[in-house]
Amino acid sequence: MAKPKRKPAREKPAPRRGERVRHILGESLKCFAEQGFERATYDDLIARSRVSRGSFYWYFPSKEALYEAVLDYCVSGYVARLEAAYAKTDRKTHAVKRVLDACFADFDANRTQYRMLLRPPPNAKAIGKLRQWNEDVAEFMAGKFAPLVAAGKLDSGTAKILPDVISAFLDGVCVRLVLDDERSVSRLEKNIEAFLCKIVEDGRA
């Protein structure tokens, strides 16, 4: 009796280009966050991504090109994430608290990205992207305080400097977050919130 023919095993489909690039960016982000740009070698990045050297070079011909792509990956959609987090906050609470809660939520959800962003950037182009990122965040904050100025609940001078003040405080929180200093982070968040809400006396919309 003839044995039934075995069905050929289905080959696992190769990841599509978009999926492969996202995978490389995600793994390279972790590598840059852990080692920094200078210490991370091209071999480290290839090994971490587990793709062939040829494929890796095809997508990213240099470490600099890869870093720029990872940096874009980190900051693209950042303000949109803040807007989404802000929309989930209680509209009846202080505007400063709402802004802080949105930023803290993003810090907590994307610590690896912040670890990389705190590393020294390798060139002027990267510095320019980080500068633009900071300006976008300041613009987001200013937009949340503008209605308070219009309603006479916040003077325009305070509203103008408040985004920079909040950003400076957030930088301190960010540093402690990437160090996983949870107790210190919790205390710092509460103290920042209490201090700024006291300065901006009536920050409810």
Where are the regions a protein language model picked out?
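Hydrophobic alpha-helical connector segments
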Residues: 69, 83-109, 162-166, 189, ...
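Helix-turn-helix
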Residues: 2, 23, 31-65, 69
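Generic hydrophobic, amphipathic alpha-helix propensity
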Residues: 20-28, 45, 70-74, 78, ...
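N-terminal intrinsically disordered/low-complexity leader segments
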Residues: 1-19, 204-205
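Amphipathic alpha-helical packing segments from all-alpha helical-bundle domains
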Residues: 76-79, 109, 126-151, 160-164, ...
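Amphipathic alpha-helical segments used for helix-helix packing
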Residues: 107-128, 175-179
